[in-house]
């Protein structure tokens, strides 16, 4: 019975589906159903509409009117778009007229608002990671209570039930972090809205014309507390009678020894000397990091370095290297400040001369008193300083003063290393220190005669020989020049390069008597005697020399194959 009824029902439905009028309806129904089933309902999501930037509830990023680097815009958009930091304001402190200490540390300051303390922690971690990956810099974050420290405080405060509310208050007060991005001098302040309203940093960093816009409005009629709040009264009474044996406010972080030196807080650095294993090395390193144009208090810096000198045990090589570098950096900083001053007077140079004289008395004599011998590298470094010092004033008195300092320094090597004056590096610097563009000392010629008679000219480098030739040609001291040149030829200390330099120096001076003497007195025959390989440059110089001297000089040209 039931089976026949089911068969009949199926046949009737089949005939109905195959009717001409209802075929199209069934097909359309089937197509719609299959299309609807091909895309599930949970994937049928309408595309997000773009945010309306003109909405009064969405504040755009406010950049300064001055030109900003691309990195600043990248970081600001990342904070706003990816980390949901709102109300972002960027201030240009580098071009600001306000006298704040942030100008010496940061060029730009960014201020943004987060929703909660947990949001602040996440933004701090993600932003540091983003800067490391994008700009390959390591930012430095301060002021944020990390999650680990926060859990320790909560466990400590949770041991007493009557202090349970304090932890929440402390968390709310720590909703601020400062990040030094190390990218184009950008400092980033991220804080909660309550903390931002409380600090009002915009008033500190804004321009003078924007001061009224960011000035904090003081509410003269604050809402009165509810006097019938029994719980509030009990809480105040409990806090009043509770005796705490600890502080719930964290101590402000003390600057390290290097940080105190960087900001030139020498008093704080003096208190931290004992915490460093080798403070003298840190002092020299910190002094080298300071900008060249910053004016230094040399007296207090020297006093601090003397405090860092070890009082027990011998002073090692590393200490003396740091001390010499320290005095070098002090001199360079002082000289840069003097060179920036276009109006150089005699009193300024005289004071600077006294400081350089102190360099000799302090370093070289102190090292001898400590039973340590100065090295050649220290003498060479000091001679280089003296030569740079001659550029400030090219007077004859300045030349005498510099040579007196050099003489004092050389006396420190009289017994420990007397052969230091035979070092080619020292000889070259000593010759340079005895003359300027228009002034020469008589000791210069005496020193060259000493080199000619007592030293091994063969051991001199080409640079030393060229320096002596240049000095004597400019001063036109021909007897001393030819005496030295003859000794160089006798010891076979002259190659093709030096010969070319010697002839070109005489050609530039263009003294026809001297040029004729070179050709007529047989100086050029030394080229043939020493079997010197004549280079192309030397051939050209010899041809110019013979052309300027009267006569055909056929024999010399044939002998030298010119």
UniProtKB/Swiss-Prot annotation:
Transit peptide endpoints, chain numbering: 1-36
GO cellular component, one term: mitochondrial inner membrane
UniProtKB keywords: Membrane, Mitochondrion, Mitochondrion inner membrane, Transit peptide
Membrane topology: Peripheral membrane protein
A Pfam match: mRNA_stabil
Cysteines paired by S-S bonds: none
Compartments where found: Mitochondrion inner membrane
GO biological process, one term: mitochondrial gene expression
Function: Probable mitochondrial mRNA stabilization factor.
Database matches in PANTHER family: ATPASE SYNTHESIS PROTEIN 25, MITOCHONDRIAL
UniProt-recorded name of the protein: ATPase synthesis protein 25, mitochondrial
Organism from which the protein derives: Kluyveromyces lactis (strain ATCC 8585 / CBS 2359 / DSM 70799 / NBRC 1267 / NRRL Y-1140 / WM37) (Yeast)
């Amino acid at each position: 019975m039931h089976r026949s009824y089911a068969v009949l029902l199926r046949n009737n439905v089949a005939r109905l589906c195959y009717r001409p009028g209802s075929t199209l309806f069934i097909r359309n129904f089937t197509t719609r159903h299959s299309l609807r089933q091909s895309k599930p309902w949970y994937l049928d999501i309408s595309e997000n509409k773009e945010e309306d930037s003109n909405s009064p509830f969405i504040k755009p990023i406010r950049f300064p009117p001055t030109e900003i680097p691309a990195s600043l815009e990248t970081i600001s958009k990342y904070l706003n778009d990816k980390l949901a930091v709102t109300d972002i304001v960027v201030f240009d402190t580098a071009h600001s007229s306000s006298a704040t200490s942030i100008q010496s540390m940061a060029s730009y300051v960014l201020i943004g608002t987060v929703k909660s303390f947990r949001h602040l922690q996440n933004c701090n971690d993600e932003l540091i990671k983003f800067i490391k990956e994008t700009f390959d810099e390591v930012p430095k974050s301060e002021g944020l209570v990390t999650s680990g420290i926060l859990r320790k405080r909560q466990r400590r405060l949770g041991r007493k039930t009557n202090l349970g509310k304090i932890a929440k208050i402390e968390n709310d007060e720590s909703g601020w972090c400062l990040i030094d991005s190390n990218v184009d001098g950008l400092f980033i302040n991220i804080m909660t809205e309550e903390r931002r309203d409380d600090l009002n940093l915009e008033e500190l960093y804004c321009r003078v014309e924007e001061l009224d816009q960011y000035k904090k409005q003081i509410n003269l009629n604050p809402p009165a507390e509810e006097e019938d709040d029994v719980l509030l009264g009990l809480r105040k009474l409990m806090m009043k009678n509770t005796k705490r044996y600890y502080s719930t406010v964290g101590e402000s972080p003390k600057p390290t020894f290097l940080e105190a030196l960087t900001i030139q807080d020498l008093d704080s650095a003096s208190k931290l000397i004992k915490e460093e294993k080798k403070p003298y090395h840190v002092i020299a390193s910190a002094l080298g990091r300071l900008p060249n144009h910053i004016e230094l208090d040399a007296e207090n810096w020297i006093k601090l370095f003397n405090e860092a000198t070890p009082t027990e045990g011998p002073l090692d090589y590393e200490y003396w290297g740091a001390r010499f570098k320290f005095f070098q950096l002090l001199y360079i900083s002082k000289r840069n400040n003097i060179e920036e001053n276009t109006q150089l007077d005699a009193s300024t140079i005289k004071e600077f001369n006294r400081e350089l004289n102190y360099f000799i008395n302090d370093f070289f004599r102190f090292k001898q008193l400590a039973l340590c011998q100065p090295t050649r590298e220290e003498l060479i470094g000091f001679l280089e300083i003296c030569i740079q010092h001659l550029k400030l004033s090219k007077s004859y008195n300045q030349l005498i003063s510099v040579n007196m300092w050099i003489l004092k320094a050389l006396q420190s090597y009289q017994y420990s290393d007397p052969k230091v004056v035979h070092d080619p590096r020292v000889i070259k610097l000593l010759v340079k220190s005895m003359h300027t563009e228009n002034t020469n000392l008589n000791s210069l010629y005496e020193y060259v005669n000493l080199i000619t008679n007592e030293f091994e000219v063969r051991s001199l480098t080409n640079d030393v020989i060229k320096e002596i030739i240049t000095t004597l040609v400019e001063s036109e001291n021909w007897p001393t020049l030819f005496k030295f040149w003859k000794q160089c030829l006798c010891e076979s200390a002259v190659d093709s390069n030096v010969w070319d330099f010697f002839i070109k120096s005489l050609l530039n001076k263009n003294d026809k008597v001297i040029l004729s003497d070179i050709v007529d007195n047989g100086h050029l025959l030394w080229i043939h005697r020493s079997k010197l390989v004549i280079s192309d440059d030397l051939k050209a110089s010899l041809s110019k020399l013979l052309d300027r001297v009267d006569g055909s000089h056929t024999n010399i040209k044939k002998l030298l194959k010119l």
